[in-house]
Amino acid sequence: MSSTSARALAARARGPRARSTRARRLGVFASTAGRGVSRARAVTRDDDASADSTLASPGVASAIPRYGEGGCFVDHCDAATVSRIREALLTSTSTASRTPAAGPGCLSSLTFAVKDNLDVRGARTGAGSPRWLAAHPSPAETSARAVDAFVNAGAVFVGKTQMDELAWALQGQNAHYGTPTNPAVPSLIPGGSSSGSAVAVAAGFCDLALGTDTAGSVRVPASYCGVFGFRPTHGAVSMLGCVPLAPSFDTLGWFARDAETLRRGGDALLPDDVVGVDFAFVRAAVAEDAFEACDGATAETLRRCVDRLAAKNARVFGAANRRGVRLGGGGGAPAERERDPSPDETRDARGLPAAPPLAEWWDAFRALQTREVWRALGGWIEAHDARLEGFGPGVRDRFCAARDAARDAKADPEAELRIVARAAATRDAAAARLRELTRDGAVVVLPSAPGPPIPRTSAAREVEAFRASQLRLTCASGFAGAPQVTIPAAALAEAEDGETGSGSAPVGISLLSAPGTDKALLALAVELTEEASSRRRG
């Protein structure tokens, strides 16, 4: 798709009212050195043309390719295919997937893209894998429920996006298709596995983009690309029509450049909150050990964000209602613990259930996820790539580990039961801890990622180490099945904070709440970032 045709499509989809000459700003990026923010240049859209949005430095986003190396859209769903699919979706999409909360036209005039592990009727689903694409040569006969919901709500489909191979990575790098260019800082990774969706939104190619999140695949790229991202309550949004990874952790998610658009996406996808429409958050728990897991500069930037949260909503985040907590216990890594904790050690100083340290959360998550992945995909892999020769580095290692774990389980069932039981106990303790921390209207504040994105040229060992540090933070909502919203740190900045230059890399802060409070959490994100959104609109 050419830049001209894509811009024309976006302009037609938005309608004449949205194609005004009013400037639109895509956001601001916080400096990881704690020196304020770098504000994006305003971009004007008019009836004749729709300029690509420019992010961290002039000309960066306009240079982001849509297809090919560095592009965020897949080649097997090209411009002609998109045009044909779009017309078919607009005329014949079933209304069966419309949620009770989705009013007709709640996404009218908005455009959206779809991660390539989600089915779109008339398009092939590649899941970031040439082997998967070759094994599934026929276009999907039906769309994923979430795609139908967006179309029924009035959104216009503009393409399918690149992703990490079979969604089992977090860096956004695909050995077969390349790495989508991060519009914020092109030399850094965009994050994954929903890399193309985050980039498409950040670059202004669409208003919303669907992704999936098993262990951070929406929250991490949202943080790295400087956009908003949402992982809903597990099971709140149907996963029908999605290539699975680890079903007990898999969720659908979505991206937007501002919280109001993110909320509108939730209106199309989410059922009503179980807590009712009058629910309000009343206090905050700041996860101190999660902040300690960040690099020093990121922790400093995000702690200033916590202060800004208090300035914007004292009812929830003010000193009287805010407290520091630890998600996990204070013990060392598993190898350093010589005994199981005594009953007295299972409660923290406030009498709340204690949980193992965050490092143990990640170990447990990895053990459970690895086994689920092989149950979900092992049969297909054995049939199509038994020697795992068609996978890229990192991803291949993880599938090898999953296969070996399955073989070991058959060879020694008792040992397997012990491994799974220990991991499940950690999961249950972590989930209980988060239930206590989010009860009665509390929201947990934690980093979306431990630092800014690393360079695209990083060595494999550095990539894997950074992935592990990310997962220590992101597995929390997976264990709890809880909703989590990623907010760009810069969206909380004050207008007078000024600019730090074009080299500033985005970082994100997250709010996590109890399962079933999704819409309330999205509304809180809108409230907290309303000032920044108004500046961008103005």
Task: List each model region and its residues.
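A short helix-loop-beta submotif of the ANL/AMP-binding
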Residues: 154-155, 475-483
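Gly/Ser-rich catalytic/binding loops embedded in alpha/beta enzyme cores
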Residues: 32-206, 435-436, 500-502
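Short glycine-enriched loops at secondary-structure junctions
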Residues: 116-118, 162-164, 233, 450, ...
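Short, hinge-like loop/turn segments at secondary-structure boundaries
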Residues: 131, 175-178, 226-229, 462-464
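N-terminal chloroplast transit peptides
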Residues: 1-23
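Structural helix-boundary/capping segments
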Residues: 25-27, 34-41, 45-70, 152, ...
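Short glycine-enriched, charge-decorated loop/helix-capping segments at active-site entrances
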Residues: 127-136, 459-464, 511
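Amidase signature
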Residues: 29-106, 271-472, 479, 494-499, ...
